[in-house]
């Protein structure tokens, strides 16, 4: 099973993916990973993409680096784990690329999907999209991880609003009902319960 967490900055993706991993690991064989990142080579790409100096990078170069990270991530970690019947929990995946590179950066969706074509056969079984007003999300980032501000955190509020619109459009167009929207302004415990209930309801996973 493949589970992904999506959302703008400061929505709690990392917190909730880690919590779910800790819960599921008590009963199932699980892998917790992230994008960009997830391996030694991937961390090199992650450092390039998230460094504060990345604000000036060409948008096509940025998209290609994300695609390279995903190709390595899939071949070295995600696919092998799925083949071993492990549950893969990923903090960001392909939906992030659409929201950030297409909606916020303004790149052609055809271009972005073409360079990520290899990933289209490995779509998550369920995606938890944590929705939050971007202004609140950025405030959370500054409050809870002030020493870990990255290049995307430094973007203007208008950029983050475009990212959110991208995610909401993906939710609306999701004919497979793969993406499950959660109000990320709710208390953490409430969100945990919503995630657990959804997994029990759809996949009969007991936590």
Swiss-Prot record:
Highest taxon, organism lineage? Bacteria
What EC identifiers does the entry list?
A: 2.7.4.9
Question: What GO biological process terms does the UniProt entry carry, in alphabetical order?
Answer: dTDP biosynthetic process; dTTP biosynthetic process; dUDP biosynthetic process
For binding ATP, which residues are annotated in this chain's numbering? 7-14
- Top EC class for this record: transferase
Alphabetized GO MF terms: ATP binding; dTMP kinase activity
UniProt keyword Transferase present? yes
- Function field: Phosphorylation of dTMP to form dTDP in both de novo and salvage pathways of dTTP synthesis.
Q: What is this protein called?
A: Thymidylate kinase
Q: Which organism is it from?
A: Onion yellows phytoplasma (strain OY-M)
């Amino acid at each position: 099973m493949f589970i992904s967490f999506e959302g703008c900055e400061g929505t709690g993706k990392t917190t909730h993916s880690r919590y779910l991993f800790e819960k599921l690991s008590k009963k199932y064989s699980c892998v917790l990973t992230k994008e960009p990142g997830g391996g030694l080579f991937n961390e090199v790409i992650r450092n390039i993409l998230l460094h504060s100096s990345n604000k000036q990078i060409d948008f096509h170069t940025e998209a290609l680096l994300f695609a390279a990270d995903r190709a390595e991530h899939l071949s070295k970690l995600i696919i092998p784990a799925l083949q071993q019947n492990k549950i893969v929990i990923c903090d960001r995946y392909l939906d992030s690329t659409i929201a950030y590179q297409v909606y916020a950066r303004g790149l052609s969706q055809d271009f972005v999907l073409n360079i990520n074509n290899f990933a289209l056969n490995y779509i998550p079984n369920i995606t938890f999209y944590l929705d939050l007003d971007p202004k609140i999300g950025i405030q959370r980032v500054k409050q809870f991880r002030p020493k870990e501000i990255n290049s995307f955190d430094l973007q203007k509020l208008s950029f983050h609003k475009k990212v959110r619109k991208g995610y909401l459009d993906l939710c609306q167009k999701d004919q497979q009902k793969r993406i499950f929207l959660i109000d990320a302004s709710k208390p953490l415990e409430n969100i945990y319960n919503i995630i657990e209930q959804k997994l029990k309801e759809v996949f009969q996973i007991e936590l």
